[in-house]
Amino acid sequence: MNLSNLWQSCLLQLQDQVSASDLSTWLRPLQADVVADNHIVLYASNMFVKGWVETHYLAQIQQICQTLAQNPELRISLKEGVKPAPKIVESTPNTSLRSESAVDFQAESSASVKFESHLNTKHLFDNFVEGKSNQLARAVGQKLAQAPGEPSANPFFLYGGTGLGKTHLLHAIGNGILADKPNARVLYIHANNFMQHMVKAVRDNKMDQFKKFYRSLDALLVDDIQFFAEKEKTQEEFFHIFNSLFETGRQIILTSDRYPKEIEKIEERLKSRFGWGLTTAIEPPDLETRVAILLKKAEEHNMNLPEEVAFFIAQRLRTNVRELEGALNRVKAMQDFKGGDIDIDFVRDTLKDILALQERLVTIENIQKVVAEYYRIKVSDLKSKSRARSVTRPRQIAMALAKELTNRSLPEIGRAFDRDHTTVLNACREVPKFREQDNSIQEDWANLIRTLSA
């Protein structure tokens, strides 16, 4: 096979082996360049794509290409950058490399005052449970911990609902930086505390010291940036701090409960800067991730939590990690008090009020109302026979949400929409595909989940 066509043939085979989302996100954007008879280089747009493909797909790609080319000696390698122009043989991709523009932390030989990072040393990557809902965010976080200041992810803007692990990941990144660079000036601060710090500086006539302090940081990690809303003077000062850190290649990481453009009463020039780097969502964990979180937390608490009990809890508490941890803490406290084994009956009795509240909060009727309002249609439209795209897509999303967020069976969901269970089953299969293929649908899904989980 002609090596120049080999990559496209490889992609065709990969279509049957990886998800459509992974194919479009990680593999299709790669550019192939034949550099020798037995060597093909795949160019990745940035260090994160390169690292992810190397870890998860390179061995698979090499095997497929060797088989297609009938050449076991064929080598596939990855580089960060852009494929060189064909006529410029000796050109080197002009890329944003760590060695050129990332932060080069220098030890402070005579620091008179110990710098406080305010990082929680218990929040690490090792105890951050990975799932589809946070996989990309965690991968980017790990890369930034190793190479802070990478231009393609500066700033790194992390958004998602309450209790999904944004703060944990923020601390994990900071702790990761310090593990490699102990003298780095890494600061974690909540947006409210930043405002209080500024107010105190103004009151004490110490704004010069305030500005100098923040502009001297190697990495600034600000949690819940949405709290800057309506705080004009805070936004003004943060704008200048942001510019100073950004221009000198210092890492900025921000979290919010919503997408940057959706934060109200924040200056447009700030929101624009929030999107200069990489913006990534953390979504509510899926069932498998919720089970893994419960088992991991139980292990940390030396609890003997049977897997079927973890499934029982995870199937009923779906909104966020904090809710799962709270439920597990209650189960542990009750076991410490009563003794005995933890089984489903024990958990059902211990969590009966929480489970009952969850059933009341998220109902099919509530989902229908929220979806109808979101798409500006009527609830009756969701139950109608209309096949208009403006109705069918919201209807499918509402059905998939009902399956995700309630314990109702497919026939029960179908009856609520005046449909049979096969229609619901089809919606539950199609909506994940839509979310993978269309970012706007994925954004709608995340917004609806946040609204229903609030």
From Swiss-Prot:
GO annotation, cellular component aspect: cytoplasm; plasma membrane
Start and end residues of each stretch annotated as Domain III, AAA+ region: 118-335
Transmembrane portions of the chain: none
Positions contributing to ATP binding: G163, G165, K166, T167
Family, per entry: Belongs to the DnaA family.
PANTHER family (UniProt xref): CHROMOSOMAL REPLICATION INITIATOR PROTEIN DNAA (PTHR30050:SF2)
Protein name: Chromosomal replication initiator protein DnaA
Taxonomic lineage from the root: Bacteria, Pseudomonadati, Pseudomonadota, Gammaproteobacteria, Pasteurellales
Gene for this chain: dnaA
